[in-house]
Every structure is written in structure tokens, then in C-alpha cells.
From Swiss-Prot:
One of the essential components for the initiation of protein synthesis. Protects formylmethionyl-tRNA from spontaneous hydrolysis and promotes its binding to the 30S ribosomal subunits. Also involved in the hydrolysis of GTP during the formation of the 70S ribosomal complex. PANTHER family: TR-TYPE G DOMAIN-CONTAINING PROTEIN, TRANSLATION INITIATION FACTOR IF-2-RELATED. Residues 110-124 have a biased composition (Pro residues). Residues 385-397, 414-428 have a biased composition (Basic residues). This is Translation initiation factor IF-2. Residues 601-608 are annotated as: G1.
Amino acid sequence: MSNSKVRIYELSKELNLDNKDILEICDQLNIAVKSHSSTITESQAERIKAKAEKLNHQMAGKIHSGSGIDRGQNLAKERKQEILAIHHKPNRPFSSTDAPVGSGQSSPLIEPPRPPMKPQPPSPSRSEVTSPITDEPVSTQEDTNGSSSSHEREPQSPMSPFDQQQPEQNTTDHNQEQQNQLKYNQEQSNQLEQESAISSELSEVNVSKLLRPPVRPSEKPASVPSPSKEKEAKSNEPTKAQPIISPKENKSHSKENKLKLPSDIKPKPNKDKDRDGKKPDKEKDKKSLSPQPKVKRESREQREPRESREQREPRESREQREPRESREQREPKLSTELKRPTPPKPPQKPKQAEVAALAIEPEDVEDTAEDLLEEDPLEALTQKPKLKRPTPPKVGKRQNWDEEEEETEEGKGKAGKAAKAGKNKRRQLLLEDEDDFDSDLEEILEIPTAVSISTARPPKPKSMKPAASGNGASKNVKAPTKAEPGRGKSAERERSERKDRKEQPQRAETLVLDKTMTVRELAERLGIAETEIIRILFFKGIAVNITQTLDFDTIQAIAEELEVQIESPEVKAAATKTTEMLDANDLENLHRRPPVVTIMGHVDHGKTTLLDSIRKTKVAQGEAGGITQHIGAYHVDIEHEGKQEQIVFLDTPGHEAFTAMRARGARVTDIAILVVAADDGVQPQTREAISHARAAEVPIVVAINKIDKPESNPDRIKQELSELSLVPEEWGGETIMVPVSALKGENLDTLLEMLLLVAEVGELSANPDRLARGTVIEANLDRTRGPVATLLVQNGTLRVGDTIVAGPVLGKIRAMIDDRGNKVEEASPSFAVEILGLNEVPAAGDEFEVFENEKEARALADQRSQDLRQTRLQQAMSSRRISLSTLSAQAQEGKLKELNLILKADVQGSVEAILGSLKQLPQNEVQIRVLLAAPGEITETDVDLAAASGAVIVGFNTTLASGARQSADQEGIDIREYNIIYKLLDDIQGAMEGLLDPEEVESPLGVAEVRAVFPVGRGAVAGCYVQSGKIIRNRQLRVRRKGEVIYEGVLDSLKRMKEDAREVNAGYECGIGVSKFNDWQEGDSIEVFEMVMKRRTLSTK
């Protein structure tokens, strides 16, 4: 035997114990096991059995309600309803003198634990009829069990009708039993506290049955709202209510309860006695055992009073299916127990009324009990767990039972059919019995359960609370809920896919072609699949992939193939005003503001000099090459009609590269001054400035400068401007023209007066009492101050400390400096200031706004920076004029040349201008790749980047950081510095041409005419006269006859006066011989040339 192995779960079945109990015993005996499936030796199994028997005896003594070994046996048989079996069996063997605790009695004991739902008086009556001697010991044990159960049951005053019958029949026995019960109750009260953990386990099993106690009030009356509810509660609580009552309360009130209950219960015990003389004793034992598990159930009911009646009803129905004899036996015990608890008495008063109303129902209960006794208890036990699960159908039945008992019987038959579908016919019988038990159980259980729950024992810890009761239903509910969202998602996907399918077939009728696009972008615009475009191009002999960029010609070819009309977008002028700085809230607080005047014109026409003469400063002398290369903002105070007026001037560059700057200046200005030199006339940048001003819809004032020069001709300027629709006022037009001399300061006052008059007509106004808004005029990175931006405030007031967002750049203003270098605390509308405190250099032309909430400002800046990053990526992908697919092939063939540049300038506007000019250079053979373009000084980081990529560093009006020059010398990096933009552009173009391979060019040397032909041997020699240039031996020659080339070859021999000569100059005669050509004729023309390698220039092809 020692070699044989035993599984833990097999041993638990044999001992009718839980696997958990067996594992605990193994831990106590130091037997190493991992789980219920672990194997142990036969000797270890014997040790466990012995230990289990000891524990069962101990538990039986402690808890007469059935928390001992029999409990484990009952659990094994009542697996599904572990609560009933576990607690009742230990009490039965212990209480019954007839049967030992052995396994032999476990089977009969199994039956009584199920009936604990309804104890009936026949048990005491039977004991009296059969034999007082046997009954007395049984009664004592029953009393002890009953006392323990009664303590638990006493709160269940609804069972009083049955209990009252028992005391009347067994008054003498009850006196003895009460004394014994009092003793047992004291012992049990201590033992119950110690074994609360065990009861909690049983309660966990029963939680499903105990789903809802009627009410948690400590008093019984509160728990009994109505007879119908009481009935339901009784049906649900019979097993639960008994175990809940505390032993102390039972002792104190046992006598009173006994006196109250005996009157009504006598007839029921008589029936039981007649049916089974010996069964009542067993049933009593079973009842005593069952109530203790019921107590546990009640405690759980107290904890979980809100459980649905549906869940409780299935449990109660199962309990009701148990033999009624056991219930009757329990009832007398409950009567004794109920006598003891006095506190439940006040609630019992309403209970008595309810009991009187329900007194009619006991007969039905007895009948159903008799039927149940005839049935096999084991079958009922096995059926109980199955019945517990179908809670929803039972709920409907209960409602029917409460309202119409007759209809419920019919419903039970239907329910029985449904139960048969579950495999067991027994379920039908149990369902039929449930009707009778519901009324009685509801009456008996409702009130006492609430009291017992509150008084019997403290609530079990959450960890001990059984989740099994709701598991079945919860799992059933959760599963569909989990599946439902999945189904919903799949349904949503299908819908979205259907929508996409419907949308795709709709092709676009027109295509706005504003930029190059990838295959994917074009497919989205046209509303077709990418494969369709790839197929079209494939048939045209062009292989592309989905991410490849298509040029305009290819896109047009695809559109024609698909019969889609191409439209070119309307090009908006760069100077068009896009944002209105004033909103509706500002209309009530508008104040006049100074005008913003932009000085525009062709390069070297005297714009900056004119501004200097107005401001009485010397800005132009500091400009490199005498040309303005970034916007300057200046304030001028002027006296007009005795008032101090202010004008803000913006000086824009006139060089062609600074188109964006001029457009930006026109966009933020109120009045445009067009400066035209009287000695130079209208130039291209003059026309551009006019177009910018008109796009911005600002009035134009023409200043004809340099009238002090003798060659000046103002009338010619007026004539040229009138051709551009700028007709002077003296000629009947509307354009104000003022001849001025910037150097001598002539007519400057007249010009300023004209500006103020135009400003008055425009009624310029702003709201200074709001947060500032405006435009970034210029921005740069200062080596000491960090990012610096020149802002023009167009509305509101800008103050130090404001949180500002300029495009994607966030910052908090640390300082503001005006045009003369003075620090200011605030800037009112129309004033331009430099600010410090930005975290990056903003782009010139970006609009800025001040926010009160920094969090909101940061969110906006982050969103803009993300959008900007995306647009830059798209531009980088489409900027190359050679597609990525052909890039590698050309690079391998050596046809592709790239010039990598790193551009650093003083301000953002200069960077913008240089990049715009670089794009205008022809890049068919050499492409310019600008790796980095930013304002600021040249740093070592830039040198490292250039070394890694082979780039050239170009600096414009900037300096080198410390260490940058030394690092560049070590790495051999070329750093070019410029202060005039057109020199920078010329050098970059020369560098691009230097990357091109030199080409072989034909260089003519001389021309000779054939005067005579001399045959020599097999060949012939041409006597020639050199007409121009010179003839050199071993050079290329071309023979022309009557204008047509008849031969090209090499001049093999050249003789002068019968001697070989290396070359012959013009005006001399010579003989020319060619080895492969002898067909000379007089009058032929011989052209001599050589091939020379020449540097190529950029072609615009």
C-alpha cells in the first residue's frame, strides 16, 4: 500500500471534505503538496484521514450547527451546495447517539442539511411518540444543535409558527433541552467565534442562496414589511436565518421564544410522526446541523442584502426540495431557539400579525414536505446546484407565487420542463415543491434573518465573502458585454469600409494643380485607387511607386487619361492682408493710433537716406554696400497743427532678392511711400512695390527723390507712373506725388503732412485695453541675448511678462527695446519693439498673440510646431526636382551633382531672401541642398555638420563663434562670409558650375583654299593658300566642297617649300596631305580646328 499513490482530490471525495481542507491538513502534517491534483502516498493518506476525523469531532463539539467532519461529507455529496452539507453533517453524528461520525451515516445526514430551510415540529413530537428515552438524548443534542442553530435561527422569527407548535407538544422536553442548549450555546458562542473562518467558507457557498435578506434593520419588525415579502424572505432564508442568531441572545431569550411559539406548531409534528417515527430524530439532527450553515448564509445575506431575489429564489427552491421532515425537525429546534432571544420580540409583534395571516399556509408546507420526504434526498441535493443557476426564470415564478399561488403551480410545471432540458427530471419535482415552500419559508425567514444577521456575528471579511453566488450570473452577463463591444467594433469597421467603397468610385471632375504631388496624394485628389495611376503610367513606360513624387507634366498626362480637367489655383499676392486684427469686442473701445508707413522702391533710389533725413539719423551709412538688407522699424515724432503726432516707418529692402520682405512690409502697413529716383525712372522693383501696395489695398504716396541732381526729370517719372495707373493729382488723378531731396531735406515737411492727411482719412484706430496682437517684422538669433524678434503691435498693448505665441514659437517677454535702444515696459498699438524671451527664433511675417493662460498658449504652440514639421517634411520630399527613383540611377552614372550648403545669416528675413534666390538658380544638372538655414552665428556644430556631409558654410552678415574657425581649419571646411547678397549668389552659382564636368569645344585655327593638286605616288597633295589664322600639323581638319563637308580627319603632313613645317601662318602657301583622303579638287576649302576643354555654365534646359 505504501507504494500506491493517492490524489488529493480523490481523498477529499472519500472524506467528503473540500480540497482546501485537505491541503490545510497537509500543511499541518508537513506533507508537501502543491495543489488538489498532487499525489501522496497511502501512508500519508492514512495520516490525513486520522487528522480529519479528529478535526471533525472538534468541530462538531464547537459548532452543533454542523461545521465539523460531517460538513465535509455533506459537501462532497452536495458539491454544488457546499454550505448545507458541510455544516449539517458534523452536528448529526455528534448529536445523534445512534450513528457515529463514520462515513456510514454521512449519506442519511446529507438529506437533513438540505431541509434546514424549513424546520418542522414533527421532530420533537416524534421523539415523544417513539420513545422518550431515545428522544431525550436526541433532543438534548438537537437542543444543543438547535440552540446553536437557534441562536442563528432566532432572528428568523418568521419560522415561529412551526416553532410554536413544537413547544406545546414538547414542553417538558423543551425545558431540559433549553438547559442543555444554554450550555451548548455558551460553548458554541466561543467556538463559533473561533470557527468563523469555517462558517465563512460555507457561507460563501450559500451566498448564492442567501442573496437577499429582506432588510438589514436590527429589529425584526422592520424586516417584515408585507406578508408577500415575508413569504419570499422565508422561502429564501430558512436555511440562512437559523445560524445567524448569536448564542448569547438565544440564551437570554430562549424561554420567551419557547413560550410564544408552541401554540401553532402542534399539527405539523403529528403528521411527521405518523409518517416516519425515526426520521424525525435524524431530521432533528440534520436540522441542527443545517441551521449552522444557515447562520453562515444569513451572515452573507446581511452582507449582501441587495442581491436579486432571482438568485435567492433558486437557492431557496433547492432548499425547499429537500425533505420536509428535516425542515419540520428544524422548526421545533427553532422554536426553542426563538424563545431565547428577547430582542427579536418587538419586531415579532408585527410578525405575529404576519404569522396569523400566514398560518393557513403551513398545511401546504406539510404536504410538500411529505412529498419531498418520499423523494430521494441525494437526488434533491444534486438537483439543487442546477436549480441555483437559472435565476431569471425563477424570479418571474416568485412574483406569480406571491400574487397567485395557483398560477404558480402551472408555471412550475413549465419550469420543470425547462429544467428537464438541463438533463435531470428531478429538477421538475423540486420546482413543483418550491410553490408550497415559498409561502411558509417566506413567513418564517424574513423577519428573523434581518435580526439574526445584525446580532449573530460580525460581517465576514471581504476576502472571505463568497463571490460564487454572483459568479454564474455575472459571468453570463460579462461575456455578452465583452462580446458586444467587439461586435460593435466589427460592425463599425464594416460600415466605414462600406462608406469608403462608396466614396472611392466617385472620381473628381476637376483637379486643382497647385504643387507637385505623390502618387498617393494624386489618387486621393482624384478619388481613385493608387494602382490605377501606377497602371496608367506603366502603360506609358514610366515605372513609379506609391510614394514617388510626380511632376506637373506627368500629373497633366494622368488627368488627360482620366478625362479630368485641370485648374490652376488663384495665386494670392504675398502682400494680401489675411487677418483682421480688430474684432467685434474692440469696436466699443477704439482709439486713434499712429499710422504705419512703409517705404518701398527700387534699390539705390534713396529710401533709407530719405528715412534718415526724416529721423535726422544716419542709418544708410551702416548698411553694407549702401543697400538695406532687412526691415527697419522707426518712430518719428512730428508737430502737426500744434499737436505732437507720431508716425512709424518701416524701411524695406529694394534688392530683388527681398521680395518677401517688401510683401511683408506692405501687408502690415497703413500707407506706402513709393520712392522713385528722378534720374533713374521706374525700375522692376518699383513695379513690384506697386503691386504689393495694391494687393494690400493701402494708399500710395509717391516721393520723387533726387530732384537736386541736374539730370533729374520729375515729369518723366510722372509720365511713367501714369502708365502704371498712378496718375498725379495735378494731372487729375488721385495719387499724391511729392518731389523731395533726401540729401538736402527739401519738401520733407510737405511729405509728412501728406502722410498725416491720408492717415486722417483712413481713420486708423485700435483698442489699447486688450491683449496685444500683431506681426513679427524681423527675427534673429543674438549670441548674447538669444532669440530676438521685432514685433509690430497692431492691436492691444504689449507688456513685459506677457505670454506670447508667435507662429509655432512660445515665449514670455523678458524685456522690450525700442528703435533707439531704450528699454520700455509696454508698447501701444502701431509701435515696433524688439522683445527678448522667446524659446526659438520665429519666422518673419508670423502673427503673434498674447495669452492669459500659459497652458493654452503652450498647447497652441505645440500644435503649430507639429503642423510646421509636417509641412517641412512634405516640402523636403517634393523639393527635389529629380524624383527619388531616378536619383540613385543618375548618381551611379555620375550625372547627378549636388551642392550641399549650410546657410547662416543675421536675421530671419535674410535667410528667407537667400533661400528664395537660390531656388531661382537653374538646377537641372546640379541641385542645391540646404542642410541648415537659420539666423545666428556660425558655430562648431555647423562645422561638424559640414564635415560629415561635405557641405560649404555660407555666412551672411554674421560672425563666427569662438572655436568655429579653428575647427573649420582642422576639418578643411570652406567658410564663405558675405555682406552683399548678389555677391553671395554669384559665388554659389560659380560653385555649382564648378561641379559640372567640363565639355569639349571646337576651337577654329585657320582656313586654307586648295589652289592646285599634285599627285604623289598613289596619293595626292593639295597645294593650298592660307587665307586666315594658321594651319597646324596633327590637328583636325574639315574639307568643304561647295558648302558641304566631304571629309573630316587629321592633318597628317604639312610642308612649306618642300620641307616639313609644324605650322603655316596666313598669307603663305603650303602643301597639305591626308593619308585617307586624296580626292582633292581646286576650290575646296580646308578648315583646321582643335578640341578644347571648356568650363560649362548652368543651363536652364
